[in-house]
Amino acid sequence: MTYLAFVRKERRLLTFAISFTFFSSFGQTFLLSLFVPYFLVSFELTNTSFGTLYSLATLSGALALPYLGQWIDRIPLRVYSMYVATGLLIATILMSISWHVVMLFFALIFLRLAGQGLSSHTAQATMARVYDRDRGKALSISALGYPIGEAILPSIIAFSLVYLHWRTTWGLIAALISFVFIPILWSLIKNERTKVVQDEDEEVASTRENYTAIFKDPRTFYTIPAILIPPFWVTGLFLYQVSAAGDMGWTAGIVASAFIAFAAARIAAGLFSGPLIDRFSAQKLFPLLLVPMMLGLAVAIFFTGHWTAYLYMGLVGMTLGLSSTLKSSLWAEIYGTKMIGTVQSLFASIMVFSTALSPFLMGWMLDGGFTLTHIFVIALATSLFSALLSCRLFFRF
């Protein structure tokens, strides 16, 4: 089935998934970073203290994600999705009325959990378990919400912060979720009868049994490093992009404009990979996941000039585009669709833990005298090791 025919046939559920990936932006680092200067002033925080607060909030959300994520396998999708959307609404309201650092901390926990965690999880788990033959297409289309959010929301938020208080801006975000996001979701999903994939005479395995099955499968350990490498290094490198601009000879304007290449490559890779997954399977394509990122790191290490920023960012964006489509398809192929929610929430939690640790490690290396080139070399080496390990899905060596 072509993309156009698939979209026409499944437009309601695809729009549902894209809405979740788009609105997950309000819990993503790229958007929250726009408010950091205002948080520092309003709550009298230092960069170090806010970084610690943010990492603790991220880790707290990661601890809750496996438990809350598994419920998508157990209750109707329309009910689960409303819980997640309501959680995101509560998080934005809490942020808009945060007058103490403790309130800020809890607002960050809920934003990271309901936004980055559960919103992304809901979209990807739904696509992975509802579709079989067209799973790759479904996941690649649903992932379009990420780059769309990255492309348009920062400018809108930055414009708002020029004229409005940051708390007012969060109040407007809460209104957007309440009067746009939730009604759209309900109109799309109110008649949905998607059920847990389970035979009538089969009991749902306990979460502990599911986890045991996951970690007994050797393929789990062949794939985890390659899954974690892109978000780990991208989180740290993007957080210190100002340092990257100086060390690599790139201006701040060049780095900002290079994000266009990043978003475009991410969209293209995600859409291109969907039909390939449907044709060849995610397991066969997975060993290629880190190749674009490794090429981008090699360009940044061995070449100089403004053009390297665009090529580096584009190639990294390509890996993230592939990753957003490949991961959920891979889980469905390896572990089946019956416990896809449990599997995906577990790995999402592990990923969030890794992204919480990345800023600490990156800051420690930069303070210890490492240059961005040194860090790129380490990132390339770890990416190469992870890529070779993932090849064991098909080759024995």
Where in the sequence are the language-model features?
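C-terminal transmembrane helical hairpin of 12-TM major facilitator-type secondary transporters
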Residues: I277-L330
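Hydrophobic core of transmembrane alpha-helices in multi-pass small-molecule transporters
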Residues: F22, V102-L118, T308-L322
